[in-house]
């Protein structure tokens, strides 16, 4: 009798284990199939300064998620904010914080990272450091010649960004030069500013630190050189946020939400850092 009871218990144990394993296997299969079936496009639009970091995040995300594509339209911060508000993209990209009226219209911001705004000159320019006050005076047209700040006897050529640019907004806010700058040229992208300054020995401009190339020279501001570490510790004062903009009361699509969650997670920090900016997370 004891043998019969033992046999029954053993059979019941095996049956229970089989059912449990079958259930777990089915759940795993269902989860895998669900992940594989998720496909579509995540449309981002906005800041040209965010090209490097969004490009890096998009590439890494696509490598982990077959069937999902992340697109980027470099239209500038203002246009990206408008695009997400109008529903023509999933996520807007802004290199400035949202204004009160933009928040009031139903938009919300999530800070992705922090980026320095580099003050750039031609590599031939001997000037390597400027104070914040000198930068403001230069852009307001009060200092017109490089010799007045330790450079050559040559007229300063002021290069800036177009109205609506997040980089311009950040630069003018920090230097207190909003609507006061005497620009020679107002260009529509970070790349254009860098190219123009690289081609003119007397030019000065501002650009995302993450985008600065060896064709230009980033000067120190108040004795502090722009770098990831000085942006992170706050000693380099010319900096601004990189922001993801979404609609407050409108849920993202499943694929857009998955990308958003990835970009703002600790998992993405290494990718963000490799793009030359400081993760906010």
Annotated model-derived regions:
Residues 4, 21-281:
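Exported/periplasmic ABC-transporter solute-binding proteins
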């Amino acid at each position: 009798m004891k043998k019969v009871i033992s046999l029954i218990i053993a059979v019941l144990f095996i049956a229970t284990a089989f059912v449990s394993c079958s259930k777990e296997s089915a759940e795993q299969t269902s989860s895998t199939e669900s992940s594989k079936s998720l496909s579509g496009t995540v449309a981002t639009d906005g800041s040209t300064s965010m090209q490097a970091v969004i490009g890096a995040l998009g590439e890494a995300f696509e490598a982990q998620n077959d069937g999902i594509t992340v697109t980027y339209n470099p239209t500038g911060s203002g246009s990206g904010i408008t695009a997400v508000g109008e529903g023509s993209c999933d996520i807007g990209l802004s290199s400035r914080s949202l204004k009160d009226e933009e928040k009031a219209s139903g938009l919300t911001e999530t800070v992705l990272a922090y980026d320095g705004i580099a003050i750039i000159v031609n590599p031939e320019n001997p000037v390597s450091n400027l104070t914040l006050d000198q930068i403001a005076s230069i852009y307001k047209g009060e200092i017109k010649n490089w010799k007045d700040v330790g450079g050559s006897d040559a007229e300063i050529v002021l290069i800036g960004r177009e109205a609506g640019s997040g980089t311009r907004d950040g630069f003018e806010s920090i230097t207190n030069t909003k609507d006061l700058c005497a620009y020679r040229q107002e260009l529509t992208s970070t790349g254009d500013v860098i190219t123009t300054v690289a081609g003119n020995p007397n030019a000065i401009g501002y650009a995302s630190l993450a985008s600065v190339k060896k064709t230009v020279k980033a000067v120190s501001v108040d004795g502090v050189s722009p770098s990831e570490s000085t942006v992170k510790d706050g000693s380099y004062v010319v900096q601004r946020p990189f922001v993801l903009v979404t609609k407050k009361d409108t849920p993202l699509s499943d694929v857009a939400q998955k990308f958003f969650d990835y970009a703002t997670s600790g998992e993405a920090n290494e990718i963000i850092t490799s793009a030359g900016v400081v993760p906010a997370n």
